[in-house]
Swiss-Prot record:
This is Uncharacterized protein RF_0129. Gene3D superfamilies: Carbonic anhydrase (3.40.1050.10). It comes from Rickettsia felis (strain ATCC VR-1525 / URRWXCal2) (Rickettsia azadi). It comes from the Bacteria. Transmembrane segments: none annotated. InterPro entries: Carbonic_anhydrase_sf, Pro_CA_2. Keywords: Signal. Residues 1-21 form the signal peptide. The keyword Signal applies. GO terms for molecular function: carbonate dehydratase activity; zinc ion binding.
Amino acid sequence: MIYVKYIILGFIMGSSLNLYAANNDIIANKEVIKVEVSNEHLKTLNEASTLLISCVDFRLIDETDKLMKQLGLDDDFDKVSLPGASLALVNDKYTYWGKTIEDTIGILQQLHNIKQIVFLDHRDCGAYKMLVGQEHLDTREKETAAHAEILNKARNLIKEKFPQLKVYTFLMGVDGVVEQIYEDVTLSSVIP
């Protein structure tokens, strides 16, 4: 806290430093950092039951971890984050994202013996706005339908390529409310 105050004082005194550069210097100057291990047993674990595929959005990092804990998967999941989560797997513009997810699943089946995939999409997603289009997301109903269609497409692709894995799909609101999206949702051909 004192260091931050010093940086702010530097601004007040007319220093040419900017907060962004100062923050980067703080990070760059850390050569060794000791991070507290959350659970001692983590050192002995070599399997994770689940791969979580979620969006990169910084707004929901803590909420995502809380969800996984509520699902009983705390300390029992690997994680891949790409823009749009399920959209990353099935979009036509950035196909290498899908390849990355598929390769990761294959590797984690061997390394950690994963048994299931959890896709976690979220509302107000920038990747969906860019790749699906705002016109498909401008009401809550349309947004739910767009996510449901893409989540189900992702589920079907995983089941086709990795039939032994269970797939669960969820949609999180920026308010933290999470809805499970089931296979029987009627699709509306949102994907361009």
